[in-house]
Amino acid sequence: MLPLKSMTLNEQTDLLHVDAGALWADVIPYLDRYGRSIEVMQSDNNFTVGGSLSVNCHGWQYGRPPIASTVESFHLMTADGTVLRSSRTENKELFSLALGGYGLFGIILDADLHVVRNERLKMEQAVVPLDDAMALFDRKLHERGTPRMFFARLNIAPHRMFDDVLITNFYTEKGDIPKLKSPKLVGLRKLLFRGSVGSEFGKEVRWQAETKLAPVLAGTTFSRNQLLNESSGWFLDHSDATTDILHEYFLPPDMAVPFLKQARTIIRAHHEDLLNVTVREVQTDNDTFLNYADQPMIAFVMFFDQRRTVDADQDMGQMTRELIDVVLHSHGRYYLPYRLHASGDEFLAAYPQAEDFFHLKRKYDPDNLFENEFYLKYARP
């Protein structure tokens, strides 16, 4: 799909027609020339449009549902080779199934996406105790209004795990929009991040750098496109001995802090090397069948370093299931694209609509042309 990456912007309707193989790294500079920006995407630009739609990614654009909410229509090649246009009014069942459908209903060939204006944004940050974080954020909303972008990070130093939260908001600001440039401080950020692997001292140094040094070195004024134009390459593990493991959990806002306190106990008990927790919010997804945001959610993206051994993988699986159990008891859900550690019962508890989803899968693809490990584990065809 990667060669399929053409794109055209309709400036009158703010609709971007883009091939599924285009990377966000291709799309962002293109839109920047027209003063436009992607409405919803994940935090890294080295993903394809088609892949992002297939997992129904969400981002740190505040007050927004996942990316499916920005899709006007797309073309889908189905199991019999037919190419269908799908939207909320045309082949609408396939619209809800293919978005966030993990490739099980066909191949998304292209899409029409709603885009927004590029803007000048001012960063404001605060470090607060975990128990005060939700109240402070609500107070900030009342005082400053709705931010355009938002994320938070948790202190992951073992002796202070989750005790402190770095809240980062981006508000619109008058003035010229900064030109799109290459990301700053990539080498330093990589050194600090990878230097925190297996090191309590490294994690403490990184926290101090993120909370005190980064705003001074990187600045506080950005364009929206600059914030989106970041690759995951700088923080990835290239070792043969270890690998990166991602988790993501979605909690109702009133259960977010209680979940973290229980998660801290579980992670410490398993002695897993937690490198990062990013916090985002996501609004209700009314577009996809297998939706993870069935209500407004707080999302916790956890990033672990794991040794490439059978024992390490088994322990990671056990810890994951324990975390998922806490999520389920908190009326939350977990994100499906990552490792298949969840049990079948946990999967069905998190996604009670899954049996109907798989039934429709077999309706549209009776010969199971489109399969993946997720389908083979949980659908039991």
Report the location of each language-model feature.
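Noncatalytic alpha-helical scaffold of FAD-dependent oxidoreductases
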Residues: 1-381
